[in-house]
């Protein structure tokens, strides 16, 4: 899987689980992508910022 597909899959993972509390989401994201919860927290924040940027500028990820 290339990096573009990975980012798309991670964003899809987050969008599908929008009803989870942040603690559970961070735990499941960390397990799914093989990272620590602290790393997951940082990646989730970065993906959220990327998604907002893309929406504001009409860019498709």
What are these regions (language model features)?
Residues 1-31, 52-56:
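N-terminal acidic leader/helix
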Residues 37-61:
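Short, charged early-sequence alpha-helical segments and their helix-coil boundaries
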């Amino acid at each position: 899987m290339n990096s573009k597909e990975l980012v798309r899959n991670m964003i899809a993972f987050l969008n599908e689980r929008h009803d989870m509390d942040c603690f559970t989401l961070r735990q499941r994201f960390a397990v799914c992508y093989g990272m620590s919860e602290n790393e997951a927290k940082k990646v989730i924040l970065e993906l959220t910022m990327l998604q907002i940027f893309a929406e504001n500028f009409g860019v498709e990820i």
